[in-house]
Amino acid sequence: IMQGGGPAIRGRTYRIFHKHSVDVVVNELVDWAKEGVAQLGCSPCSLVIGIGRTHYEATAMMIEAQVYGDFNVQSDLEKKITDKVNESHVGALGLGGKTSVLATFLKVGQQRASGVRIVSLSPNCCIEPRIASVEL
């Protein structure tokens, strides 16, 4: 990969003390995404995010978001994350530009009342596995 690493080493799974505000989680995710996208060696990417109670659950949610993600169907929160990362003008390959992220796929699992969420984020090249078929 051209500029120093692919999605496998740019992801992150960690806890966020959210103070019962979704904006705290979104801002932390955007900071992580900007850093990962700038170092990603591929064209504009898609962000895949899972939020859960444990590292295992957050990662499972992230994988499920990737499997069922649809570029044409984006929630308001997914659009908000995509727009905030694109406002950084990191661009493809970290070379600058208006489009760093094509879409965000987000899946949130059940939560508990504590002030901590485990978040798993992976900036994926836009050619990561998608559901497709070819008939010959």
Describe the role of every protein-language-model region:
Residues 1-136:
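Non-transmembrane, aqueous-exposed alpha-helical and coiled segments at domain scale
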